[in-house]
Amino acid sequence: MNAQALVLTDNAANKVRQLRDSEGNDDLMLRVYVTGGGCSGFSYGFNFAESINEDDAEFVNGDVKMLVDSLSYQYLVGSVVDYVEGLEGSRFIVQNPNATTTCGCGSSFSI
């Protein structure tokens, strides 16, 4: 898997670093995944992991790691993971060039 296929922005890396530091656990990594659901067919999910699975692709921004499993990877190739703060609240978002449609809030998509 090409390590340049996904990008973790500086904003997202800074937020992960902040959350990781608040937990006092430098081993935490951001896991990004795709699951069925949402109004457009697929949804993005985010959680923290302490270990890398055998089928994970690993992407790095400074001292922050982002993990994507092999199934989700095929839907996320070329995507940019960012962190935004706005009227809708603060959240991680995925700018996915593979998505043909997205819902209004951007949390689900179809291909």
Curated annotation (Swiss-Prot):
Which cofactor does the UniProt annotation name?
Answer: iron-sulfur cluster
Cofactor note text: Binds 1 iron-sulfur cluster per subunit.
The superkingdom of the source organism is Bacteria
Q: Which GO terms describe its molecular function?
A: 2 iron, 2 sulfur cluster binding; 4 iron, 4 sulfur cluster binding; iron ion binding
Q: Which keywords fit this entry according to its UniProt record?
A: Iron, Iron-sulfur, Metal-binding
Q: Name one GO biological process term.
A: iron-sulfur cluster assembly
Sequence positions that bind iron-sulfur cluster:
39, 103, 105
Q: Which InterPro entries match?
A: FeS_biogenesis, FeS_cluster_insertion, FeS_cluster_insertion_CS, FeS_cluster_insertion_RrpA, HesB-like_dom_sf
| Protein task | Required for insertion of 4Fe-4S clusters for at least IspG.
> NCBIfam families of this UniProt entry?
iron-sulfur cluster assembly accessory protein (TIGR00049), PRK13623.1 (NF010147)
Quaternary structure per UniProt?
Homodimer.
Similarity annotation: Belongs to the HesB/IscA family.
Name recorded for this polypeptide: Iron-sulfur cluster insertion protein ErpA
- List the source organism: Acinetobacter baumannii (strain SDF)
The encoding gene: erpA
